[in-house]
Amino acid sequence: MDAATTRVGLTDLTFRLLRESFADAVSWVAKNLPARPAVPVLSGVLLTGSDNGLTISGFDYEVSAEAQVGAEIVSPGSVLVSGRLLSDITRALPNKPVGVHVEGNRVALTCGNARFSLPTMPVEDYPTLPTLPEETGLLPAELFAEAISQVAIAAGRDDTLPMLTGIRVEILGETVVLAATDRFRLAVRELKWSASSPDIEAAVLVPAKTLAEAAKAGIGGSDVRLSLGTGPGVGKDGLLGISGNGKRSTTRLLDAEFPKFRQLLPTEHTAVATMDVAELIEAIKLVALVADRGAQVRMEFADGSVRLSAGADDVGRAEEDLVVDYAGEPLTIAFNPTYLTDGLSSLRSERVSFGFTTAGKPALLRPVSGDDRPVAGLNGNGPFPAVSTDYVYLLMPVRLPG
């Protein structure tokens, strides 16, 4: 695929293709279109038919998306139409071949017995998509989707604090570290990938929303290619490219300083606990029914059990006891139930390990692996060294009453 869409002008573009592939590509491109574009043409998707098939493009000067689709191009050309409208139409069409052709300043779309006539926008006013930087490395699509979803959950959503709305991407040769925080929780994931150069080093801040959309929508295929440039020029374009399986997108990097997160991660704990993730999530949801939105869920840890409780006399109280492997002095700590279940769901593990210091300091959640030493085998009441793992979720507690 060309790095930037080639324009051949609004002509009598005519093509035929399968509804499913058309709808998937249009939906993927339209997801990134602005709700309130600065100029009308930025709400459109550009359809370009050529010898290479059909290219569907979208761009708002911050994020670009482009998908290549197999199609029978009867007559080449380009046309610009409303992206959200075309996405709604293609998703609702019956599962039959789709025919599209330009008629003057309108586009005719047919599928089975359904017919649509859509207005067009001026192709000549549409901006040229940015060129992808040089490829920096690649990794399996499933690993990319999992890792991004694990850290994006902790990213902030307040645009007045741009340094917290991004995912920090650190590259050191074959190792990539992803980190995100909203000040109340911090998620860090480390993974291996195939770097274009073994001595490559870079650290950039990428909008979390864009990366999360790319992970959820799925580039698909066996590998995802990340493009930030190579050599000393890594990240200097201020652009990240993501490509694979006939799709490519770019996003501008954030020009902000991410917090120094490693110093926040504890090296030892005064108490540790392991328990079943599914049971804990269900218990949190159950007792939180009597809590106001965002109110705390308390956890009282003792040898062999943890009591979850929530609520107050005026709204009702709830509690549930669960079995836990615990080492350390008895501890009572409280969390925002939504943030806690977010972290538990991100572990991708049947069991969770908690590492505590005090009731007023962050708790460290990590997945339990088969190599973990049983809590019952730990000596005394700590301190217990923090265990190295490829994913951690650091969560601030909520102040206990009184």
UniProtKB/Swiss-Prot annotation:
Q: Check the record and name the SMART domains matching this protein.
A: POL3Bc
Protein name, as recorded: Beta sliding clamp
Question: Where is this protein primarily located?
Answer: cytoplasm
Q: Which GO terms describe its molecular function?
A: 3'-5' exonuclease activity; DNA binding; DNA-directed DNA polymerase activity
UniProt KW keywords: Cytoplasm, DNA replication, DNA-binding, DNA-directed DNA polymerase, Nucleotidyltransferase, Transferase
Which SUPFAM superfamilies does the annotation name?
DNA clamp
Q: Name one Pfam family in it.
A: DNA_pol3_beta
Gene that specifies this protein: dnaN
How it assembles, according to the record, is: Forms a ring-shaped head-to-tail homodimer around DNA which binds and tethers DNA polymerases and other proteins to the DNA. The DNA replisome complex has a single clamp-loading complex (3 tau and 1 each of delta, delta', psi and chi subunits) which binds 3 Pol III cores (1 core on the leading strand and 2 on the lagging strand) each with a beta sliding clamp dimer. Additional proteins in the replisome are other copies of gamma, psi and chi, Ssb, DNA helicase and RNA primase.
Q: What does this protein do?
A: Confers DNA tethering and processivity to DNA polymerases and other proteins. Acts as a clamp, forming a ring around DNA (a reaction catalyzed by the clamp-loading complex) which diffuses in an ATP-independent manner freely and bidirectionally along dsDNA. Initially characterized for its ability to contact the catalytic subunit of DNA polymerase III (Pol III), a complex, multichain enzyme responsible for most of the replicative synthesis in bacteria; Pol III exhibits 3'-5' exonuclease proofreading activity.
